[in-house]
């Protein structure tokens, strides 16, 4: 049974605030110990990742982007299902090129409602197709593995 709506709403507000402030500790601090992250669309074939694999990636991204701004367009919260969706446009400066990502983040709250259990992120694929290779080259690493490659197929 999902947590009370007020508890979820407080967590959602903290999540959006940390995202707007682009604060790694506050943002990641809201993730549960069993947190999982999935990049959408599913057709991209990227694997679901646990907290310990995603947190360093977020810290790196947060450390790379400067003058970060988040324009939240819509928030939908379904407390009866323990879920919320945030649609926003993020913009920032980076050494590898300007960042402007239109995205929707789908979150599932923990049973207690005070943590984020999972996050699924749908990005602007046209932008990310151009920007991601520059970002990965700037940091000296290749693209994350696809689900197929991660499974050893």
Curated annotation (Swiss-Prot):
Pathway: Pigment biosynthesis. It comes from the Eukaryota. InterPro entries: Fungal_Meroterpenoid_Isomerase, NTF2-like_dom_sf. Induction: Expression correlates with the formation of the sclerotia and thus the pigment production and is directly regulated by the cluster-specific activator CPUR_05433. SUPFAM superfamilies: NTF2-like. This is Ergochrome gene cluster protein CPUR_05425. Gene3D superfamilies: 3.10.450.50. Part of the ergochrome gene cluster responsible for the typical purple-black color of the ergot sclerotia. The ergochrome gene cluster produces several ergot pigments including the yellow ergochrome secalonic acid and its derivatives, as well as the red anthraquinones endocrocin and clavorubin. The pathway begins with the synthesis of atrochrysone thioester by the polyketide synthase (PKS) CPUR_05437. The atrochrysone carboxyl ACP thioesterase CPUR_05436 then breaks the thioester bond and releases the atrochrysone carboxylic acid from CPUR_05437. Disulfide bonds: none annotated.
